[in-house]
Structures are given as C-alpha cells and as structure tokens.
C-alpha cells in the first residue's frame, strides 16, 4: 500500500539536495588586503582612536624610566628580599653560578645532592637581589646577576670541596664567584681555596712547626754545653790514662 501511494503521489517522497560549495576567487591576501569600500573606509577612519602625541624632545629611555617609576612596589618582593639578606648574613659560603639551559629534572637532582651536603640551592630574580643587597656590604655582587643564575648557600665554608665536586658533573652550572667568610672571591680564588687543607690540618701543621722550632732552639742552646762536657770528658780520660802509665812505670822501677 505504501509503495502504491509513493508511486501515485511522487511529492510525498523526501529527497536531500546535493550541495557543493565552490570558491571562484583566489586566496585571501591577509598581508595586503583589498581596500575597503568608500563608506566603510570612512567609518573606519572616524572610529580610529587618537592618542596624544608626545614631545619630540623626550627620548624613549626617559619614557621608559617614567613608566618604571610609576610601578608600585610589591610587598611580597620585600619579604623575599629579606629572606635573601638573611641567607647572605648567616652563610659562611655563598657560590654564584650562571645557569645555562637545563631541565627541571636535572636541577632537581642537583638540588637533592647539594641538600645532602648541607648546601642549599636557591634562585631569585635580579630585581629582588638588587633590593636585598642595596646598602649592604654585598652590593659588589650585583654585576654577576645579569642573566639566568642560581645561588648556593652553606653555613660551613669547608663544604666548598663537596660543592665543586657535585657541580663539576653538571656542565650547565658555570661558577662565577662567591663569598667566603664575608670576603668576595673570584672563581680562581674559590678553586684555590678548595685546595687548601681544613682548619684542623692547618692547626696540626702549625703546632708541629712550633714544636720543631722550639726543639731546634733548645738543641742549639745546649750544643756548646754538650761540646764542653765532651771535651772535658776526653781530657779527663786522657789525664787518667797518663797517670796510670806513670804509676805502672814507677812500679816496674
């Protein structure tokens, strides 16, 4: 019955039209678009904003300085700056490294190895470092923070050997300088400081040198007395032998 109705009434069947979209123009030129219509161009020209023109006498550097001056100081930066200042004041060893391209996993492994040796790896922004060292004896380290960097703090300056041993296996960390016992040292001076013996060894060597000098002094003071005693002993033995020979000759006579 349905087939009969479809044959008798062809309008009852639904057919989906086949559509195909075609572009009869070339590619859209984004870099050099076609000029808009006159009416549209006039509307665009009217709606464009007008900015106040700066005087020609003002340079770009002055404008940038004014923009920087207008920025408000972040209180959190002051907190981090106090933390950096606290690390600098309570650390006997501060090593500054230039940090090349390195993955997060590698820097994490280095941080763990340093932490086992009581060495703490930190990284701060240049603005925070500047805020922390301004007006302090550490202001001379600012030229070392012009690029990506990291800092290692330690309360024991004798850990310089362990620090160099760990960072020698990480070529991405380049030693620039450091602070040892409130004294700024270069890279070569830090390397030389690491080759020096520890404090206990130096004290033992000093005690040995002092004992050797005291022993030599006593020996030199007793030299003449010992020589005199030896000469007198030889002289006494010589006189005794002479007296013995004289007595024997007298008895034979």
UniProtKB/Swiss-Prot annotation:
Keyword terms of this UniProt record: Mitochondrion, Ribonucleoprotein, Ribosomal protein, Transit peptide
Protein name per Swiss-Prot or TrEMBL: Large ribosomal subunit protein uL10m
CC terms in the record's Gene Ontology section: mitochondrial large ribosomal subunit; ribonucleoprotein complex
Listed Pfam families: Ribosomal_L10
Assembly and interaction partners: Component of the mitochondrial ribosome large subunit (39S) which comprises a 16S rRNA and about 50 distinct proteins.
Organism: Drosophila pseudoobscura pseudoobscura (Fruit fly)
Disulfide bridge map: none
InterPro entries on file: Ribosomal_uL10, Ribosomal_uL10-like_sf, Ribosomal_uL10_bac_type
Gene (name only): mRpL10
Compartments it resides in: Mitochondrion
SUPFAM superfamilies assigned to the protein according to its UniProt record, in alphabetical order: Ribosomal protein L10-like
GO molecular function, one term: structural constituent of ribosome
Tree of life domain: Eukaryota
Family recorded in the similarity comment: Belongs to the universal ribosomal protein uL10 family.
